[in-house]
Amino acid sequence: MEAKLKALEEKAKLEISQADSTAVLEQARVHYLGKKGELTEILRGMGALSAEERPLVGKIANLVRENIEAALEEAKATVKSKELEKKLMAETIDVTMPGKAIKLGKKHPLTQAMDDLKEIFISMGFKVVEGPEIETVYYNFDGLNAAKNHPSRDMSDTFYFNENTILRTQTSPVQVRTMEKSKPPIRIVSLGRCFRNDTPDATHSPMFHQIEGLVVDEGITMGDLKGTLEVFAKNFFGEDTKIKFRPHNFPFTEPSAEVDATCFKCGGKGCGVCKGNGWIEVLGAGMVHPNVLRNCGIDPEIYSGFAFGMGIDRLTMQKYGIDDIRLLFENDMRFIDQF
């Protein structure tokens, strides 16, 4: 029996050394050391041995089992290393092959428009400032000379948190906050989100974007306002763009005007974009009302100023020929990729 055990060990070691995969090694383990394996079959004959022979044979059998198990572990480590090396070789990246192109995102047309507006007004010496979106009634209405019964104060137009706190309906409150903190000369623009209680449709949104401009200094005139807006229009819509003023009424400016620009699409000849009249409404503007200056501690006898406000969403739609404001807020890459 001792000879059988030694022969079994040599046979097992030879087979294990020739194994080329972990699967073959597992088969060898089961074949030699399993419950129905060759070692078990040999040990079943121990019943025929004398009492003196059994301990010796048992000791040899245990040693054979240990040697086979050690050979299996050693071979398993070697085979696993070779399998990993083979797998890595198969997965080797050819660095000479061109890489997969990564699709770059694009600026949203609103973001493009805001960047253009900032660049235009900064080039004219304006400073960009910001203000809170959650605003007080004073800064949104009272400080801007809006009458107590002005329709814009109604809950049908304005989102109220309480009787004194609202979501701002315009960027104009930044004018008051700036004039309270700064002494003339002042030359600022403010861009941001505004909110009105509108039902969404092709031209209205409860959330939209505005840019507000303010200049205050000694001797500021309507001519300065016109010159500033002409530079803006030519830079934003095109060098051939012209503007015209129409009398209007705003509580925070006097005199006030709505400003039209020649249609960027037809150059003033008349088309579907401008509804055939050659002009498109662009913004509201005027000279800062003396009451607004007084509210901010600025003497209107010494200083004057002009202000203007534009809907950035509308400007974007006009510039890029977008006919539905809702498209600006749907985050559809098929739409954004067009610009």
UniProtKB/Swiss-Prot annotation:
Cofactor: Mg(2+)
Cofactor note: Binds 2 magnesium ions per tetramer.
Keyword ATP-binding (UniProt): yes
GO biological process terms held by the UniProt record: phenylalanyl-tRNA aminoacylation
EC annotation from Swiss-Prot or TrEMBL: 6.1.1.20
Enzyme class: ligase
Annotated SUPFAM superfamilies: Class II aaRS and biotin synthetases, tRNA-binding arm
Record's catalysed reaction(s): tRNA(Phe) + L-phenylalanine + ATP = L-phenylalanyl-tRNA(Phe) + AMP + diphosphate + H(+)
Broad class of the protein's primary localization: cytoplasm
One Gene Ontology molecular-function label: tRNA binding
Chain positions recorded as Mg(2+) binding sites: E254
Cellular compartments per GO CC: cytoplasm
Cell compartments where the protein resides: Cytoplasm
Keyword entries, A-Z: Aminoacyl-tRNA synthetase, ATP-binding, Cytoplasm, Ligase, Magnesium, Metal-binding, Nucleotide-binding, Protein biosynthesis
Annotated HAMAP family: Phe_tRNA_synth_alpha1
Record family assignment: Belongs to the class-II aminoacyl-tRNA synthetase family. Phe-tRNA synthetase alpha subunit type 1 subfamily.
Subunit text: Tetramer of two alpha and two beta subunits.
The protein's name: Phenylalanine--tRNA ligase alpha subunit
